[in-house]
Amino acid sequence: MQDEIIDFFRSPALLFYMTLMLTICVVNGSQQVGEVVETEFHAYRLHQYEISGNIYGCKNYRVSYEAVSLGARTLRRTMVTTWRDLLTTDVDDMWALSTGAVLIFIPDNLDELNDIDRKAFIDLEAKLLSAKTDLAVYVAPFNDDAVSILHDVNTRSEKAPTALQHLLQSLSGNTISITSSDQSPELPPSYKPLNIVGRLSSGDRAAPTIAFVAHYDTQSAVPGVSPGADSNGSGIVALLELLAVLSKFYDSPSTRPPYNILFIWTAAGKLNYQGTRHWIDEYQKGFDSADYAKSGLSRKGFSDDRVDLAICIEAIGRKTGGFFMHAGKTPSENSVAAQLLRRLKYFSSISPKKNIELVTKKISLTTVSAWEHEKFNIKRMPAITLSTLPSPSDPARNSILDLPSALDEDELIDNIRLIGEAVLGYILDLPESGPSSDSRVKSEATMLSKDAVDKQRVHHFIRQFASRPRPVGDQRATESITSNLASVAAGYGNVFKSAVTITDAKAFGVTQNRLVAERVKPAVFELVIAAGVFTYLSAFYYIATHSQNTIEGTVAAIRKSIF
């Protein structure tokens, strides 16, 4: 029996079993009780696009680094911070400090920001919009997972009161490793966003044409979270509602105005109005595209259109008490634009009263176009832009805070009605000053009935087209909105699609990515564990090989006490 006990302790199986149990206990004990080891969340990448060979935004998308706090001077790390902490930080210096990635947490509900915070947030957006960096920059909503990640990162970055505590923290503290899914920002060569064109025909090929134009894509510092409800969701909705309202006048030959009307939803408006440029090129060439031919519409029906005025609509959904007519120069008195302006001012004087102002801005051929109408003006086609924004540099134009809650539906409906009344008055050649030229006669006669602009329909259009991000770099979102736009517009007029060839510019994908934050021990901790295991095995081997005499003496003592 003595030999059997000695052989049992010398057995390699016992050595292997003890080693395995020790390793499992050490690994399992390295994590805190109840702690989530891995957290997965969605993050949204800082914008990236190229115009005239210049790349703006962040050029990288891949994240696979250890997380550190703001201001840490370390290379190949992911700097994790909140938007409030960035307010007092030199963003340009932050790009220079890190060569890995940046993760910024923003409020989960932006509607809850007060006026002071909104202004601060817009100031931060301006810095991010002008950024040019090689880092992978992501933004994520602030939630419970963000609180946990920030706590671990900040705890590890805090300086311990003593050197020993700092050493122990470095050896045993958790680190956060953040990785991203491997997606390429390069869009497939086959991807081309679409222009959607609807038409109401007067039945006369020689009849002049009025064109309504609105780009449907969105853009901000973080396009994946920007629904662009006002810019330019309100423009999309305005064109759809105007199409629905004006189509009733074209249902019967007896009420059909002597004008053709085009409704053009253009792609890549935030990319120097690529869709508008493409449509103008097609228009001047006579629409020879294959997509146009597949529409089954008469080619002559479009190529013979003489555009008297292109009315571009952008951001008309905020309550500002009126809007602006933007033009390249002051229109001549008898021009269509001048007549439209006078009619807008007349109808704006009827309740509810609004203020309509003309704003002129010279067109620059060496920079990107400030307004959509400039693309028409460059080709010597008359065009104006109607907008509540006084300037193309207004920060609300490309803001994450351009949310559906910021829209005033009643204001949008009033503006749509005002535009519809003015255009109807022009194409039907009604008196500019109302039904009577006698100033003593007061009348509020209008062409549209009280409920012509349908509130429920406008509300539905806002939910469908102005409540979701639709950056041109998101192929799925772009294809979805163009499909829905074409489907809705086809219910009121003839519609065709035209694939847009983007030139002198480039859009990039990966507007949204999946990030994984994993809690791991530092690499030096593994060395300490390895040293401990080696020490244990050495001690166990020594005891196992030198314990025969001890065991024999113990067995002899037990046998003697028994017998």
Swiss-Prot record:
The chain crosses the membrane at residues 523-543. The keyword Disulfide bond does not apply. GO terms for biological process: protein-containing complex assembly; regulation of protein targeting to membrane; regulation of signal transduction. Residues 30-522 are lumenal. Glycans are attached at residue 232. InterPro entries: EF_Hand_1_Ca_BS, Nicalin. It is found in: Endoplasmic reticulum membrane. Disruption phenotype: RNAi-mediated knockdown causes a moderate resistance to nicotine-induced paralysis. RNAi-mediated knockdown in neurons in a hyperactive mec-10 (A673V) mutant background increases touch neuron (TRN) cell death. CDD domains: M28_nicalin_like (cd03882). Residues 544-563 are cytoplasmic. May interact with the levamisole-sensitive nicotinic acetylcholine receptor (L-AChR). May interact with nra-4 in the ER. Belongs to the nicastrin family. This is Nicalin. It comes from Caenorhabditis elegans.
